[in-house]
Amino acid sequence: MWEKVDQLTPSRYSPYRFFSAQEWAAFRADTPLTLTYEEVKRLRSLGDPIDLDEVRRIYLSLSRLLYAHVEASQLLFRQRQQFLNMEESYKTPFIIGVAGSVAVGKSTMARILKELLARWPSSPKVDLVTTDGFLYPNAVLREQNMMERKGFPESYDIGAVLRFLSAIKAGMSRVRAPLYSHLSYDVLPGEYQIVDKPDILIFEGINVLQVRDLPEDGKMVPFVSDFFDFSIYIDADPRLIHKWYIDRFMRLRETAFRDPQSFFHRYSQLSQEAARSIAEGLWQNINMKNLNENILPTRPRADLILRKGSDHLIEEVALRKI
């Protein structure tokens, strides 16, 4: 009988190859740095220390790897067209899924990756869509007594997510993705991002690698990740993510929360001690539970795992073997 194997511990049985950040940086080869300091500063999220050195160390090698995957998919597409004796037709978008906990740096990573990929010599059209817009509106969550479960799998309109990704993969034009406001903490009614036949789509969200229970009647149930050509999980020790979440909350209290239109404006009026207590409660009762129950278990499903250290920078890379 097989013993349980920890797939994320380096061993002969692990499906991953593991690299330090320094080893990974060497795979950049001659990939050019096409971003400036000011652009990285604009793209990074509040409190994220990523700089050009981190882009050189991690992102340029990642860009080169993804270029190889995209080129391989295009070659396979052409060979399949030839095999089927088909006329030249539209190549479906290459979809990259980006997953990980809140406060771990998914949004920064996705935005920087989008800019790097769009600057390849082939100048592909790259779009970025987040799953936030696919959350049920707050009114629906309140009606179903799920506001404290916001961010958990059941708070998303998975049917809408699957219809969106199906339309993208079907090569449909002007596909609509609902927009979300972090200021109002709600879906923006009637507002959409238009995704029009990109070459590459980056789809970012905490639960994009989630699987669901199969129905007893044997009907096919597609998972979001079924539509991905490549998937990335941003990882870190939960104790570090906890610290980053609290630090971010306290910074937002001094910035975005001060806007009277902010859903969290009331927290800006609290003392520092009271605000920190609120943040701790949100972490313990919502975000930590979601991480342990729904997000962390999806980590072994990723093609690439980027693990961060205490300085919020990548210190280890795990790449799935092929």
Swiss-Prot record:
ATP binds at residues 100-107. It is an enzyme of class 2 (transferase). Pathway: Cofactor biosynthesis; coenzyme A biosynthesis; CoA from (R)-pantothenate: step 1/5. One of its GO terms (molecular function) is pantothenate kinase activity. Keywords: ATP-binding, Coenzyme A biosynthesis, Cytoplasm, Kinase, Nucleotide-binding, Transferase. Its main location: cytoplasm. GO terms for cellular component: cytoplasm. Disulfide bonds: none annotated. It comes from the Bacteria. GO terms for biological process: coenzyme A biosynthetic process. It is found in: Cytoplasm. Pfam families: PRK. Its EC number is 2.7.1.33. It catalyses: (R)-pantothenate + ATP = (R)-4'-phosphopantothenate + ADP + H(+). HAMAP family: Pantothen_kinase_1 (MF_00215). PANTHER family: URIDINE KINASE. Belongs to the prokaryotic pantothenate kinase family. NCBIfam families: panK_bact (TIGR00554). This is Pantothenate kinase. It comes from Brucella abortus (strain 2308). The lineage of its organism: Bacteria, Pseudomonadati, Pseudomonadota, Alphaproteobacteria, Hyphomicrobiales.
